[in-house]
Design a protein with these regions (language model features):
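A broadly conserved amphipathic alpha-helix scaffold signal in soluble, globular proteins
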Residues: 1-4, 57
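All-alpha amphipathic helical-bundle segments outside canonical DNA-binding/catalytic cores
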Residues: 154-166
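ATP-dependent phospho-/nucleotidyl transfer catalytic cores
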Residues: 8-77, 82-90, 168
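Active-site-proximal structural scaffolding
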Residues: 69, 78, 89, 104-107, ...
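A structural signal for short hydrophobic/aromatic patches embedded in well-ordered alpha helices
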Residues: 52, 142, 161-162
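Protein kinase-like catalytic domain
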Residues: 3-10, 147-150
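Active-site activation/catalytic loop segments of kinase-like enzymes and analogous catalytic loops
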Residues: 108-152, 168-183
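Catalytic activation segment of kinase domains across protein kinase-like and atypical kinase folds
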Residues: 83-123
Length: 183
């Protein structure tokens, strides 16, 4: 409902964190980290850099569609995760918190980032990767619930690319954290 309530708000709202969910920018940061290899760790993670680069063009789809005039930016929370939702004692949603990241972005931002935390079977910082998986039941339930209110303002292209959004945010976090690790 957060996005539905803001669907008609003009996107002139300022960008609070420049390029926060800009995949092309995040890949450029990774490429700079790889080129500089400040911490001398590149050799041990080169395989992961190669995997990320192999998917880079696909993962920059949002920025490409926007440049082509096919995908608009909307007002988004840009840090949608379970920890940023307050619930009452019965488990009902009271409100969304942590509003310092509310700014124009692609609809993929809120949909994909929420699933990154909600559909993860492990903890966000889980050290045991055997605990980490993607819960398709949560994805399906969330997508159905999301579309009940969002289908009135989403374009067919946005709806078609919601599964892309679910893949984008784990990818983006990997790119961000790997750049930090290499630096």
């Amino acid at each position: 409902n957060f996005q539905a309530m803001l669907a008609d708000v003009p996107t002139e709202l300022g960008e609070t964190i420049k390029d926060f969910h800009n995949m092309e920018f995040r890949l450029q940061q990774l490429r700079e980290a790889v080129a500089e290899n400040k911490a001398g760790r590149l050799a041990e993670v080169q395989w992961l850099v190669d995997e990320l680069e192999a998917r880079a063009e696909e993962m920059c789809k949002g920025e490409r569609l926007h440049r082509e005039g096919k995908l608009a930016k909307r007002i988004c929370h840009c840090d949608t995760k379970v920890d940023n939702i307050l619930f009452d004692a019965d488990g009902n949603v009271l409100c969304v918190i942590d509003l310092d990241t509310v700014m124009p972005n692609f609809i993929f931002s809120d949909f994909g980032d929420f699933l990154r935390s909600a559909a993860n079977t492990g903890r966000e910082d889980d050290k045991d990767l055997d605990n980490v998986n993607f819960n398709m039941d949560i994805f399906k339930a969330f997508a159905e619930g999301y579309l009940k209110s969002a289908k009135v303002f989403l374009t067919p292209l946005e709806i078609e690319n919601l599964p892309y959004a679910a893949a984008l945010f784990p990818y983006m976090q990997t790119v961000r954290f790997l750049a930090d690790y290499i630096n």
